[in-house]
């Protein structure tokens, strides 16, 4: 798992972790995924944040919520589908296999901000292997109320970009959650300042191994909560062999590509 915060083009915070995930059954909506930190590290330059201490909530839990096959309520339930228009727009090859491209966007009559994007469906199996989507930011005020938990008086925070990606991997005839990434860009404006500042948050998780043997649900006291700030759960960079053979992964490099 990795998360970063950039102020304009400068990285001001980075956190990384090896995490253990309890993946709840897809067939049971009442059981939820869980994660705990096995080991983690962080680095930050608070001075470059000026008067803003920008924090990202959720950590690995937020990336697990991008498993839209497990968390279907936003897009894939029959009730949610009433809010969207879907269209088959073409065929593309992914991992040497043809995939249908299904594009979706919220209906013009729906006022609350929802998602828009593309599903990639394998032609032979009809498996959803990848999804790329974003949040509709046409109504920026409504979107801001969803993304921002707390901000100082006199500050305007406007979401500019909210993009997401989820991938699944086939193993022994079944498809499993393999990767997800979220990137959200905010424009920050102080009423008495002339220039705007842009903050970009990125979080991503890549699954490296899985087992179905002796699976134990993560205890509540160890579980990362959606309200937790990941950077407050780990220590500063200390382990020179943190990633083993992959110890140096540049902030702009996808961890999915780096660990293949």
What is each of the regions a protein language model found here?
Residues 67-122, 127-135, 166-170, 175:
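Extended beta-strand-rich segments in extracellular/periplasmic secretory proteins, especially
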Residues 141-149:
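Solvent-exposed beta-strand/loop surfaces of large extracellular or lumenal domains
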Residues 1-83, 95, 148, 153-260:
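Surface-exposed, low-complexity/disordered segments
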Residues 109-113, 138-142, 187-191:
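Short, cysteine-centered beta-strand-loop-beta hairpins and adjacent loop/turn segments enriched
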